[in-house]
Amino acid sequence: MPGSEDLRKGKDQMHSHRKRTMFTKKQLEDLNILFNENPYPNPSLQKEMASKIDIHPTVLQVWFKNHRAKLKKAKCKHIHQKQETPQPPIPEGGVSTSVGLRNADTLPRLPNAAHPIGLVYTGHRVPSFQLILYPNLKVPANDFIGHRIVHFGCCRDPNIYCLYPILESQVCAPSFHSGSPACSSNQSRER
């Protein structure tokens, strides 16, 4: 039937599949360099970059979109794997978990603008650690004893936290300050 052959050609033209783009090693290197410089290039920059590495601007746009999604997926998978790591069991006769504020006289010397908010987690006989939030301290001013914790993209928390070893004898009356921002796994998954 001559009519059915024409119908089939029209159907093929409507649903033609685009062939997969194969990038050369040099193009991939260039794309990764460009992505590291700017993961969200504007349309004029996309055209310029595409002409430099000899690909169509739409192909470049799709590669950037896919690469951002790939990195986001890998980041979420990494965070999810960290959350699934088993916690060490509390030794027999261990001290029950308590949360409280650290004595102010045991804090390291701080800049005048910093007011620490600390939580103590003691669940073992060995020394535990205290996480202290410095809400007004954006850039470390002094060398503190302990470890600085700065968030890099896992949440929108611009604060700096310091982790200090603490002994149970330094724990005050139990209290909890819920006003300190924290990076939750829900926030990480939403972004």
UniProtKB/Swiss-Prot annotation:
One of its GO terms (molecular function) is DNA-binding transcription factor activity, RNA polymerase II-specific. It is found in: Nucleus. One of its GO terms (cellular component) is chromatin. One of its GO terms (biological process) is regulation of transcription by RNA polymerase II. Gene3D superfamilies: Homeodomain-like. Residues 16-75 bind DNA. It comes from the Eukaryota. Keywords: DNA-binding, Homeobox, Nucleus, Repressor, Transcription, Transcription regulation. Residues 1-15 have a biased composition (Basic and acidic residues). Transcription factor that acts as a repressor. This is Divergent paired-related homeobox. The gene is DPRX.
